[in-house]
From Swiss-Prot:
GO terms for cellular component: cytoplasm. This is tRNA-modifying protein YgfZ. GO terms for biological process: iron-sulfur cluster assembly; RNA modification; tRNA processing. The keyword Phosphoprotein does not apply. It is found in: Cytoplasm. It comes from Aliivibrio fischeri (strain ATCC 700601 / ES114). One of its GO terms (molecular function) is folic acid binding.
Length: 318
């Protein structure tokens, strides 16, 4: 059911994006972690360095099984008296089960938060946040809750129902709209995510986690580390996530197959991670593809030809 408070924003490909939007992020959720052993427990579970994470910083990370396959990709930050892991809701029940698997041996409480998640997007979102917070850090505590910087044009606010009402009364400058605009910014920044169809299918490097500082190769042991390290040092990873552009009749979904050209034929080429469809049919998508394809390789999805778009970051190892 469409929200009347956060209506759909119907954009065409060549339209400028709104300079300031606020959306309720119903397709996202938080896992929170508190307790005396929270830091050491999480450090042994995830790809990022929890120990070195400053109070006012945020980092990408992944949680893998013993074979290095991802249960989830998240952004981790300090929240209240513990940690928050911001990630896709469709896979969060599976992720909760997996990340709690060894918690019985530690003083740690792990749960899915019932807090409200609001997404602030656009070039002027930061101006508003600066006016209503006392910090210029990437994670800020305010009277409305915790603000966390997701990308240069995206900020997350973790808040509550009663604070949300007061907040909305102060947002006259913002366009309130549904969370599709958040997805568009996420895709333009080529930020990875794991929805249920991709759960436990790929190693972190297949979703470019190393390129956005989501993997520490200097920290101690964690679940799946051996596979992740081999992918870096022995070159066993054969996939990466790319940004594609094409036309579609309907928005592609996570897990959809995309074909690639091989001579004059087509064969399965990869898997959709996320997509945004403009009103005129133009569509941007992130897809996991072989990382050794020729530059002139074409792709086909929904009987339409798609092409690569340059990523906003480099995939080359340092």
């Amino acid at each position: 059911m469409m929200s009347t408070l956060f209506p759909a924003l119907n954009l065409n490909k060549d339209e400028p994006l709104p300079s300031f939007t606020v959306s309720e992020l119903n397709d996202w959720a938080l896992i929170t972690m508190i307790g005396a052993d929270k830091k050491s427990y999480l450090q042994g579970q995830v790809t990022c360095d929890v120990v070195s994470l400053a109070q006012d910083e945020i980092t990408f990370g992944g949680h893998c099984d013993a074979k290095g396959k991802l249960w989830s990709i998240f952004q981790l930050f300090h929240h209240n008296d513990g940690y928050a892991l911001f990630q896709r809701k469709s896979a969060i029940e599976t992720e909760l089960t997996e990340i709690k698997k060894y918690a019985v041996f530690s003083k740690v409480d792990i749960s899915i938060s019932d807090e409200i998640l609001l997404g602030f997007t656009g070039d002027k979102a930061l101006e508003w946040i600066n006016q209503h917070t006392d910090s210029n850090a990437n994670v800020r505590v305010s009277k409305f809750g915790t603000f966390a910087k997701v990308s240069d044009t995206q900020w997350l606010l973790v808040t509550t129902d009663d604070k949300k009402e007061e907040l909305l009364s102060l947002l006259s400058e913002a366009t309130l709209c549904d969370e599709a605009i958040w997805s568009l910014h996420h895709i333009k920044h080529a930020l990875p995510q794991i929805d249920a169809p991709l759960c436990n299918e790929h190693i972190p490097q297949a979703l470019n986690l190393q390129a956005i500082n989501g993997i520490s190769f200097k920290k101690g042991c964690y679940t799946g580390q051996e596979t992740v390290a081999r992918a870096k040092y022995r070159g066993i990873n054969k996939r990466a996530m790319y940004l594609l552009s094409g036309l579609s009749e309907a928005r592609p979904c996570a897990g959809d197959a995309i074909e690639r050209s091989v001579g004059e034929n087509w064969r399965k080429g990869g898997t959709i991670v996320s997509a945004y469809r403009f009103e005129d049919g133009h569509t941007l998508a992130l897809a996991i593809l072989p990382n050794d394809l020729d530059e002139d390789t074409q792709f086909k999805l929904q009987e339409s030809i798609w092409e690569k778009v340059e990523l906003p970051y480099s995939l080359n190892d340092e």
